[in-house]
């Protein structure tokens, strides 16, 4: 019962804060607020430079592989479990999946910076 009360209270408070954040936004815009800040001086050029889509794709690929590697971090503690063979099999399958994903990215030329 205590767990249900805690979950209900947390859900209600979170929902209330989200609703307040959406209902009461500060939408007062003026030129000083929307202009880029360069150490108190007027901007020398455009601060809104175009974003490289290739950089974005490489960054997303890095994040995905980094997340999958993070799944392997608890492996030394998992090996101490009762069923070591299953743990090693699952970790080996995850490494194979990572290798297949890397090969796919390489074949699709997703890792080439210049084209």
From Swiss-Prot:
Cellular component terms (Gene Ontology): mitochondrial inner membrane; NADH dehydrogenase complex
Keyword Transmembrane: yes
Cellular compartment(s): Mitochondrion inner membrane
Pfam families linked to this entry: Oxidored_q4
The keyword Electron transport appears for this protein: yes
GO term, biological process aspect, one: mitochondrial electron transport, NADH to ubiquinone
Enzyme Commission code: 7.1.1.2
Membrane topology: Multi-pass membrane protein
Reactions performed catalytically: a ubiquinone + NADH + 5 H(+)(in) = a ubiquinol + NAD(+) + 4 H(+)(out)
GO molecular-function term, one example from the UniProt record: NADH dehydrogenase (ubiquinone) activity
Residues passing through the membrane, by range: 3-23, 55-75, 86-106
Superkingdom classification of source: Eukaryota
Keyword terms: Electron transport, Membrane, Mitochondrion, Mitochondrion inner membrane, NAD, Respiratory chain, Translocase, Transmembrane, Transmembrane helix, Transport, Ubiquinone
Enzyme class: translocase
Assembly and oligomerization: Core subunit of respiratory chain NADH dehydrogenase (Complex I) which is composed of 45 different subunits. Interacts with TMEM186. Interacts with TMEM242.
Role, per record: Core subunit of the mitochondrial membrane respiratory chain NADH dehydrogenase (Complex I) which catalyzes electron transfer from NADH through the respiratory chain, using ubiquinone as an electron acceptor. Essential for the catalytic activity of complex I.
Family affiliation: Belongs to the complex I subunit 3 family.
Name by which UniProt lists this protein: NADH-ubiquinone oxidoreductase chain 3
Protein species of origin: Elephas maximus (Indian elephant)
Gene that specifies this protein: MT-ND3
